[in-house]
Amino acid sequence: HHDVHTLCTLSDGMGSGVKANILATLTSKIISTLMIGNAGIDECVETISETLPVCRERGIAYSTFTIVRVKHNGEVYTAEFDGPEFVMLRNGVLDEPEKEMRVIGGKEVWESHFFAEPEDMIVSFSDGVIHAGIGRLINLGWKRVNVMEFIQRNYDLKMSSRTMTRNLLEVCDHLYEGEPGDDTTVATVRIMPRTTTRVMVGPASSA
């Protein structure tokens, strides 16, 4: 969270386990730190390419990312690299913002710019979500269209972003039968009007 915007970054490192976690954590940290300092996506991608440790087995440094930045005036910027596309609901209905692709440092990054409306919900997730159930309850896994249908069907106007995230993770855990075959990460952003809280502080009553 920043004075002029709120930033949400989701990353998924190559492979699984500790190595993947390190790659994802570094990627998210680099993007968050640079963008809070008003750096652009070009600088973020270049820094990631120069910073991530190279895998000895595969000989590359790799991590997907999805960025959602919401300014306090409602302007939204998103950037996605090589992960599943985020799912957006507006008034409880699926909505697909217009996107443009740019090649940055050899990577195809999809960007979008739009203005949010109250109660918009943006759900980002790693490919562990769409791979849920492969070879188990669903032979070919859970497709993105299935994820979209689930999100829309389970959406409620009063639902928090945490609840949507938990619901999606729970159904993935069910499809994996409690044994995830891939790292599964979900991040949800819900647009809400700013509210004011007043706190009164004073000496304790002598009574």
What are the residue ranges of the model-derived segments?
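C-terminal catalytic subdomain
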Residues: I130-A207
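Short helix/loop capping segments that flank catalytic or ligand/cofactor-binding pockets
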Residues: V18, L89, F125, A132-I134, ...
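DG-centered beta-turn motif at the end of beta-strands
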Residues: D12-G13, G83, M121-V129, D183
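Primarily the active-site beta-strand->alpha-helix module of PP2C/PPM metal-dependent phosphatases
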Residues: H1-T51, F115, V123, G135-V147, ...
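Beta-strand scaffold of nucleotide-dependent catalytic cores
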Residues: T9-S11, T78-F81, R198-V201
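Catalytic core of PPM/PP2C metal-dependent serine/threonine phosphatase domains
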Residues: N21-G92, V109-W110, M159-R194
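Acidic loop->beta-strand submotif enriched in PP2C/PPM serine/threonine phosphatases
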Residues: H1-D3, E96-G135
